[in-house]
From Swiss-Prot:
Domain of life: Bacteria
Any one cellular-component term (Gene Ontology): HslUV protease complex
Protein name (record): ATP-dependent protease ATPase subunit HslU
SUPFAM superfamilies: P-loop containing nucleoside triphosphate hydrolases
Lineage: Bacteria, Bacillati, Bacillota, Clostridia, Thermoanaerobacterales
Location of this chain's protein in the cell: Cytoplasm
Function: ATPase subunit of a proteasome-like degradation complex; this subunit has chaperone activity. The binding of ATP and its subsequent hydrolysis by HslU are essential for unfolding of protein substrates subsequently hydrolyzed by HslV. HslU recognizes the N-terminal part of its protein substrates and unfolds these before they are guided to HslV for hydrolysis.
Residue sites binding ATP per the record: V18, G60, V61, G62, K63, T64, E65, D272, E337, R409
Molecular functions (GO terms): ATP binding; ATP hydrolysis activity; peptidase activity; proteasome-activating activity
Name of the gene encoding the protein in the UniProt record: hslU
């Protein structure tokens, strides 16, 4: 896990997310506390638990993006789950333990990628030698004639040495051509491990959901690895062999051990739509999708051990960030025990027209920049006037006010409509510079605006 100060975390988040300072500060402090915990003695380390966060705010204001960006920033295992997907134990659907299993899978992928990067160069060299063997063909050493050995014929030895030198020269020649890309389209026959393994579905005590169990894993020590012959171009063979050799160079036991450790200490689980499992009214009978799910989530957030296919995983120090709009239910509608597990409560503000202008201008991945880059691939330079950006922001804000408020996601709809005609005709406009003006925005978006203007008068 990377070490950032709270200010540095907020500065990094500012590059992608506009406003919401309070939420950014809360997650920054939560992450810094993890770093501080790692510096404590073992006795204290076990006592300090993460201060879980609950974010309250309308859709499209940056709740999910904040959680996703911090996980990427500190390189922590991260998983986003929808609270509405879970059902109480005993009912058809996903059980809550699956969020921890998903987190461990994410951690295994992360650690594996890191290990693979470290062995890339070594794997390339081994793969190159294998590929040369397939192209040139391995020279089988002939056993010496007993009479040659007895009488030590120099001519036979000399002939063998000459052949060896010739083969070595040929291999180096092929190696150079490979590196220059001269043989890329040459088709070669290679032998690779068959990765298509039989699968079976079964119920396990890991949860009520169906799990795919890989038979190859179960019988790994009994069944030999299956090989198959493939005919592929050299450039493709190079990629396949490099991947196979890299896999052979990493120790999966080490990967799993490190992944479980990271998931337990650095893992972040983002539970979205938590307001949808809050009981907001009078209900009769068993409330399958609400209170039961809350009670099932409770022990995981509180700290328990979950069985995964990689081994037991403790959830005591996983950081949980929950989010919801809470426009119908309130945070107080969650069961009291669950409320108590989220000591930090943050409110995110609805976006204003000024926020929309900043969203279009400031972030590194702003939509305006994305469309510029997309059309640059067609040889078109796109520029925006300040008035045009203000007009786009105004349209998005107006539509949000008059219909469903979906926050910054409204900008995707507006921008797609704005660039629809231009994107369609882009191949015919190669080499041109297009300036998006206020008039152009109003012309392209007039249908959308007229529709919402008319809706005001429909009962």
């Amino acid at each position: 896990m990377k070490n950032y100060t709270p200010k540095e975390i907020v500065e990094e988040l500012d590059k992608y997310i506009v406003g919401q300072k309070e939420a950014k500060k809360s997650v920054a402090v939560a992450l810094r506390n993890r770093y501080r915990r790692n510096l404590l003695s073992d006795d204290f380390k076990e006592e300090v638990t993460p201060k879980n966060i609950i974010m309250v705010g309308p859709t499209g204001v940056g709740k999910t993006e904040i959680a996703r960006r911090i996980a990427k920033l500190v390189e922590a295992p991260f998983v986003k789950v929808e609270a509405t997907k879970f059902t109480e134990v005993g009912y058809v659907g996903r059980d809550v333990d699956s969020m921890v299993r998903d987190l461990v899978e994410a951690a295994v992928r992360m650690v594996k990628e890191e290990k693979l990067k470290k062995v890339t160069e070594k794997a390339k060299k081994i793969a190159e030698d294998r590929l040369i063997d397939y192209i040139v063909g391995k020279r089988k050493k002939q056993a010496k004639n007993p009479f040659e050995m007895l009488f030590n014929y120099p001519a036979a030895e000399k002939s063998e040495e000459t052949e060896e030198e010739s083969m070595q020269y040929k291999r180096e020649e092929i190696r150079q051509k490979l590196r220059n890309g001269e043989l890329d389209n040459y088709v070669v026959e290679i032998e690779v491990t068959d990765t298509s393994t039989p699968m079976m579905e079964m119920y396990t005590n890991l949860g009520s959901e169906e799990m795919n169990i890989n038979l190859q894993d179960i019988f790994a020590d009994i069944l030999p690895k299956k090989k198959k012959i493939k005919k592929v171009p050299v450039y493709e063979a190079k990629r396949i062999l490099e991947s196979e050799e890299a896999q052979n160079l990493i120790d999966m036991d080490e990967v799993i051990e490190e992944a479980i450790k990271r998931a337990e200490n650095d893992g972040i689980i983002f539970i979205d739509e938590i307001d949808k499992i809050a009981s907001s009214g009078y209900t009769a009978g068993p409330d399958v999708s609400r209170e039961g799910v809350q009670r099932d989530i409770l022990p995981i957030i509180e700290g328990c051990t979950v069985m995964t296919k990689y081994g037991p995983v403790k959830t005591d120090h996983i950081l949980f960030i929950a989010a919801g709009a809470f426009n119908i239910a309130k945070v107080s509608d969650l069961i009291p025990e669950l409320q108590g597990r989220f000591p930090v409560r943050v409110s995110l503000k609805p976006l204003t027209k000024e926020d929309f202008i900043r969203i279009l201008k400031e972030p590194k991945n702003a939509l305006t920049k994305q469309y510029q880059e997309l059309l640059r691939t067609e040889g078109i330079e796109v520029k925006y006037t300040d008035e045009a950006i203000e007009a786009i922001a105004e349209v998005a804000y107006l539509i949000n006010q008059q219909s469903e408020d979906i926050g910054a996601r409204r900008l995707h709809t507006v921008m797609e409509k704005l660039f629809e005609e231009l994107s369609f005709n882009a191949p015919d406009l190669k080499g041109q510079q297009i300036v998006i003006t206020e008039e152009y925005v109003k012309e392209q978006l007039k249908d959308s605006l007229n529709k919402y203007e008319v809706n005001k008068y429909i009962l």
